[in-house]
């Protein structure tokens, strides 16, 4: 078992019955010229987050954790995005950006597009699981819950973008399904001003889960590995 120092208190988990979840590390969310950038959100500080996710993934994989990668988006015709009868049609900033800039139609978050692809620095490896998702939460219309339960996984460690949207939405839904959720704060990035990051982390550590960081996470996994060898 691994004990991870976190806020508001430490949490203990078995790495081999836990998953590291990488949320939406796509060009859309982390690269200049991607959806968030074109929609007016600042993505200039995402590079350190990418590096920290690389570090966390390497440590988690070595410890035997399942790695799950999410990609947010829809089919090329945007049927999966929902029409006017869906609140997603009205609230998705990607869909609104394309309606306001018709030349972008079919380019934002469309499966197969550059925007939809994971950033070059973060590539899934054999044994990892890659899941598409059509909404903010990774539990909505995906097999995530079934995948986790069939493997006896109850603890989820979250990284990715955006902390205050898809990361928090997935962690919250997991909380209601009896999963223990931890966010590595320096391996996440918000959509919007910095206060959005702080508010999301406050909500998570106060009501829905735990907050730690990449160095602490890696040290905890390393200590567990040494203990097993000894």
Swiss-Prot record:
Alphabetized UniProt keyword annotations: Hydrolase
SUPFAM superfamilies registered for this protein in UniProt: Isochorismatase-like hydrolases
Induction: Up-regulated by the nitrogen regulatory protein C (NtrC also called GlnG) and repressed by RutR.
Residues annotated as catalytic: 24, 133, 166
Coiled coil: none
Enzyme class: hydrolase
Alphabetical list of InterPro entries matching this protein: Isochorismatase-like_dom (IPR000868), Isochorismatase-like_hydrls (IPR050272), Isochorismatase-like_sf (IPR036380), RutB (IPR019916)
Family stated for the protein in its record: Belongs to the isochorismatase family. RutB subfamily.
Protein name: Ureidoacrylate amidohydrolase RutB
Organism: Escherichia coli O6:K15:H31 (strain 536 / UPEC)
């Amino acid at each position: 078992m691994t004990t991870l120092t976190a806020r508001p208190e430490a949490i203990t988990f078995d790495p081999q019955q836990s998953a590291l979840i990488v949320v939406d590390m796509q060009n859309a969310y982390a690269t200049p010229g991607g959806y968030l950038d074109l929609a007016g959100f600042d993505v200039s500080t995402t590079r350190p987050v990418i590096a920290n996710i690389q570090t966390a993934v390497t440590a988690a994989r070595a410890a035997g954790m399942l790695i799950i990668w999410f990609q947010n988006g829809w089919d090329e015709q945007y049927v999966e995005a929902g029409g006017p009868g869906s609140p997603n049609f009205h609230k998705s900033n990607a869909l609104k950006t394309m309606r306001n800039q018709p030349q972008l139609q079919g380019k934002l978050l469309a499966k197969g597009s550059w925007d939809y692809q994971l950033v070059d620095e973060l590539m899934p490896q054999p044994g990892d699981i890659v899941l598409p998702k059509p909404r903010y939460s990774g539990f909505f219309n995906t097999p995530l819950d079934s995948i986790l339960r069939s493997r006896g996984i109850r603890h989820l460690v979250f990284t990715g973008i955006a902390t205050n949207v898809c990361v928090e939405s997935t962690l919250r839904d997991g909380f209601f399904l009896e999963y223990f959720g931890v966010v590595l704060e320096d391996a996440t990035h918000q959509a919007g001003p910095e206060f959005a990051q702080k508010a999301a982390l406050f909500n998570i550590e106060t009501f829905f889960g735990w907050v730690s960081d990449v160095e602490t996470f890696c040290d905890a996994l390393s200590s567990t590995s040494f203990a097993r060898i000894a």
